[in-house]
Amino acid sequence: KGKSSSLIFSNYNFKSEDIIILRNELILEANKPTVIIDKKNQTLYEIDKLSYSIEDEVLKGEKIFINTKFNQPFSDKYFFKNAIFNLKDQSYIAKDIDINLKKDIFGNKKNDPRFKGISSSSKNGVTIIDKGIFTSCKKNDKCPPWSVQANKITYDKNKKQILYDNALIKVYDI
């Protein structure tokens, strides 16, 4: 009971309250907000409820916020309702997603590139978003000047390329 901090494999620093450790299963659980810092990948996780397999390095969680390269001026920010992460290979599957890419990803710091979708998966730098929307327009109180909706959006971070299946471009205020 109470506040606790755990360092696992010298890579993952867990900070939470009332952590439960299932020794035989090598599982760490927390039902209260938890912060995890992945030192190797410079990634910050904030999770409301989690289960972590120490042996497999698999993290399951609810109400998740992720900040990649959190110590740099520009970073990607992820918001998921539920997700499962393989921390070894940096892959995931998630539900109810909102991804804000770093502002200068496409060479313009004034943009706010972002995805929203029903679900998402990612492996080897390729992210697939189901029933998604993308825009890079600056955020404001109104809807963006344009967006692309698609049944499937494939974002290749390595190539900085976005592919759409069955897409619809929406342009506003013409």
Annotate each language-model stretch with its function.
Residues K1-I174:
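Structural signature for solvent-exposed beta-strand/loop edge elements and short helix-capping sites
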